């Protein structure tokens, strides 16, 4: 049987993931409540999302729901268990999923660095122009304005004297 996922959400009390789906054979919309057991404010959201998605009981229903979306819903659930408001949890997710250009990536631990790199890879893939894109241009020439004065740096002039 084929199920088409329409909406996916989270219920905080008692903790559960809720999926609104359409049964392809009947064409009826239905709601599936998947209880979340053994999840605390210290739980790993990635692991919990993988376990729910790979659970044989829910697997066929969650085929069209991305792992990232389930992870995000588990982060909301964990934030609720930690006593955070929805706004605080959304702000935390926003901080974790965006890259600050001024952030020093050398100071991050391996796990955080891997997370930042995966975010950068996703952004690159999303923004990358491919040959089959309608707005793709093979040889782009860009002219830079020559009116502005070139700024020199102190180390530029120092290195010229050494040679």
UniProtKB/Swiss-Prot annotation:
Gene Ontology process terms (BP): cilium assembly; microtubule anchoring at centrosome; vesicle targeting, trans-Golgi to periciliary membrane compartment
InterPro entries, per database record: CEP19 (IPR029412)
Principal location class: cytoplasm
UniProt keyword terms in alphabetical order: Cell projection, Cilium, Cilium biogenesis/degradation, Cytoplasm, Cytoskeleton
Top-level taxon: Eukaryota
Keyword flag Transmembrane: no
Location in or out of the cell: Cytoplasm, Cytoskeleton, Microtubule organizing center, Centrosome, Centriole; Cytoplasm, Cytoskeleton, Spindle pole; Cytoplasm, Cytoskeleton, Cilium basal body
GO cellular component term, pick one: ciliary basal body
UniProt subunit comment: Interacts with CEP43; this interaction is required for its localization to the mother centriole. Interacts (via residues 121-150) with RABL2B. Interacts (via C-terminus) with CEP350; this interaction is required for its localization to the mother centriole.
PANTHER family with a match to the protein in the record: CENTROSOMAL PROTEIN OF 19 KDA, CENTROSOMAL PROTEIN OF 19K CEP19
Protein's UniProt name: Centrosomal protein of 19 kDa
Organism of origin: Rattus norvegicus (Rat)
Gene: Cep19
């Amino acid at each position: 049987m084929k199920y088409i996922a329409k909406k996916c959400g989270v219920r905080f009390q008692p903790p559960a993931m809720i999926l609104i789906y359409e049964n392809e054979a009947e064409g009826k919309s239905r709601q599936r409540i998947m209880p979340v057991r053994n999840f605390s404010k210290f739980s790993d959201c990635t692991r919990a999302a993988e376990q729910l998605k790979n659970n044989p009981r829910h697997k066929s229903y969650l085929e069209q729901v991305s792992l990232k979306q389930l992870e995000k819903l588990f982060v909301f659930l964990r934030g609720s268990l930690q006593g955070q408001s929805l706004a605080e949890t959304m702000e935390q997710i926003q901080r974790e999923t965006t890259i600050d250009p001024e952030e020093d990536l050398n100071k991050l631990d391996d796990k955080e660095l891997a997370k930042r790199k995966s975010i950068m890879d996703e952004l690159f893939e999303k923004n990358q122009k491919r040959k089959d894109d309608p707005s793709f241009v093979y040889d782009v020439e860009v002219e830079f304005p020559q009116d502005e004065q070139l700024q020199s740096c102190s180390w530029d002039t120092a290195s010229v004297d050494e040679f």
